[in-house]
Amino acid sequence: MISFNTYRLKNGLRLLHYYDKNTQMVALNLLYDVGSKDENPKATGLAHLFEHLMFTGSKNAPNFDAPLQAAGGSSNAWTSVDMTNYYETLPAQNVETAFWLESDRLRYLNLTDESIDTQKSVVIEEFKQRCLNVPYGDLYHFCNDLAYKVHPYRWPTIGLTVDDIKNASYEDIKSFFAQHYAVNNLILCVSGHIEFEKAVALTEKWFGDFAPANIPVRNLAQEPVQTEQRILSVKREVPQNMLTMMYHMCGRRDADYQVCDMLSDVLSNGMSSRFYRNVLVKSGLFTELDASVSGTYDPGLFIVRARLTDGVSFAKAKEAIDAELADFLRTGATAYEIEKCANKYESTQLFDMLTYEKKGVKLCQYELLGDAADINKEVGKYRCITQDRLMNVAKNLLNPDNCSILYYGPDA
């Protein structure tokens, strides 16, 4: 059970606080409710671009890193389809430095032609390194575009194309910042060796006088039900052929999300899983085979991913996976498998939140889902999954008409 405090500023900023007496450090975790799904389809990559722009300095801190490092701190950030997250860790006695830096860049971010052009160049180079000049780099561009036809999950967080990043105008960038980077679109968690009263006081001091922004109401295109199987072959000179099968599933807030997640574990988590025992070891057709969920807040994907052994055809590989899925749907999950996966999830959850920093991130994510208190209910949601419920979800999910298949590699 994680005990934490909550506070809401009059301008809408949500503050979470977790006290840890076993450290002399404090972490600030700032989660902005904006991800790549909030981008214009003709101007993708802005959410990730801002992950870089936020470190270009501000009016009173031209070099963001210098005062933080002088205070013994460090920082980083990441972007996803659903959110953008920034965090600092520093000694408790210097915590106000982080509040000042975050407040200043929210109010006076250095959005100049020079800083924008510099960071565009950095992101374009990152795009080339991650997506164009490395084996399998564009795999998920094809996966997303195949599985999604209207929802903005159809492009990756880094952006759809280099040209989208290159052609983003100063006006587009400034408008994106004004619309999404605001106190009423921010969840702040202060965790570590700091009392709640001090966390509240510092938050009020550095963020209390911000005016709330007029945050756009999300009106995202909803993905229609897929009614027939989709297949795409992409020829690429990569070391191994890859087969990816994607089934539409519910989003992170849905009651069946944990069931889908457990289904992926029953199939592929560990050496006692179905895929490992019955397919990977026995068939020799694959060097890797796993199942996972995308974990997105809007309806996402249940993904079966395989690397094929040299000389194995895509048809034979798919036949083996289809046969194992059909056998699973016919025989069903055992009570032992469900209990094993629930135990594994609980241990993973505990290890994932051992530190005050990780608790801070998780608290923000659960708050964005709807209620930070749900962090203490998550294990129970896995514990109450029954065999019947798991199989009902599996039978609806693992429907061939609900599947998009990507054949990727030299033999595609």
Where do the protein language model's features map onto the residues?
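C-terminal regions of mature proteins
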Residues: 187-190, 307, 328, 336-412
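Histidine-acidic residue clusters that define the catalytic metal-binding segment
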Residues: 1-6, 144-186, 218-223, 349, ...
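An aromatic/glycine/proline-enriched structural segment found at the starts
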Residues: 2-5, 149-150, 154-157, 182-251, ...
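M16/MPP (pitrilysin/insulinase) zinc-metallopeptidase core fold and M16-derived inactive scaffolds
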Residues: 27-89, 155-158, 269-285
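Buried hydrophobic packing residues in well-ordered domains
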Residues: 12, 30, 48, 86, ...
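A structural supersecondary motif
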Residues: 165, 244-248, 267-308
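N- or domain-start disorder-to-order transition segments that initiate the globular core
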Residues: 1-24
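M16/insulysin-pitrilysin zinc metalloprotease superfamily fold
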Residues: 57, 89-122, 290, 294-352
